[in-house]
Amino acid sequence: MHSDASNFQLNSHLSTLASIHKIYHTLHRLNLTEDVGPESHGTACCSRAMPPRKKRRPTAGDDLSAKKSRQDNVYRKQEALQIQEAEAFSSKRCLEWFYEYAGCDDVVGPEGMEKFCEDIGVEPENVVMLVLAWKLDAQSMGYFTLQEWLKGMGSLQCDSTEKLRNSLDYLRSVLNDATSFKLIYRYAFDFAREKDQRSLDLNTAKCMLGLLLGKTWPLFPVFNQFLEQSKYKVINKDQWCNVLEFSRTINLDLSNYDEDGAWPVLLDEFVEWYKDREMS
């Protein structure tokens, strides 16, 4: 009797397991179960039995860190904006800069010009000052008016000593362009002459020629000697412009100089003086 009861229980369990196995495979075919092995099922059961993990609540330290990060972003944006404003040209700043050197008559005169040159680290006789004056379209040597300053510095985008210092190399490079050099050379004549005179006095002419041609025209020292011993007291604009053309086109031995060409008498006399000097 006992044996029959045990067999009945065993058969009942086996039948139940077979039914469960059949149901599982049916669900599997219908994609209603995960394709996992027995071990995974055990893990899944365990995980379903475990309660879900709670999200960690932010602490006071987290709040401070987030606040500091936001503040840092604000500071970085403000700093970037300040840099942009400092780099951008400001007419107001340019005007304030002008009055560091100008007198009560709204003109930078000799004293202000001396301080200005000292601040930008350039000697007043440096050729870069001539280029700057040309950029400002200054009308009188040693003077910058308010209008010239604002217009010229605006074109250079300079509203401070530091910005102009950083632009000096650019101003020097302008002389390397033949067209710009010719414009500056012609400008220099009117810039340097007395406004009630049509010509340059000889001493001023020699200084300006030395500034513009002294380092690029090998014959300049000889030409300067010629001027010193000549009868000339002034140089007119036609003579001035032809000296530049002469320096650019005539060979150093003067072999291609045409005495019948349209050169001014000044240069005819220089060529004659030079040849006599070479022969003696």
Curated annotation (Swiss-Prot):
Residues forming the DCUN1 domain are: 89-275
Alphabetic keyword roster:
Nucleus
The biological process GO terms on file are: positive regulation of protein neddylation; protein neddylation
Domain of life the protein comes from: Eukaryota
Q: Where in the cell is it found?
A: Nucleus
Q: Which residues form a coiled coil?
A: none
Q: Where is this region: Disordered?
A: 37-71
Q: What is its main location?
A: nucleus
Span-the-membrane segments of this chain are none
Listed under GO cellular component are:
nucleus; ubiquitin ligase complex
What molecular functions are annotated in GO for this chain? cullin family protein binding; ubiquitin conjugating enzyme binding; ubiquitin-like protein binding
Summary of the function given for this chain in its UniProt record = Contributes to the neddylation of all cullins by transferring NEDD8 from N-terminally acetylated NEDD8-conjugating E2s enzyme to different cullin C-terminal domain-RBX complexes.
Question: What does its UniProt record remark on the domains?
Answer: The DCUN1 domain, also known as PONY domain, may mediate the interaction with cullins.
What PANTHER family does the entry give?
DCN1-LIKE PROTEIN 4 (PTHR12281:SF8), RP42 RELATED (PTHR12281)
| Subunit structure, interactors included | May interact (via the DCUN1 domain) with unneddylated cullins.
- Protein name, entry field: DCN1-like protein 4
Q: Which organism is it from?
A: Danio rerio
Q: Which gene encodes it?
A: dcun1d4
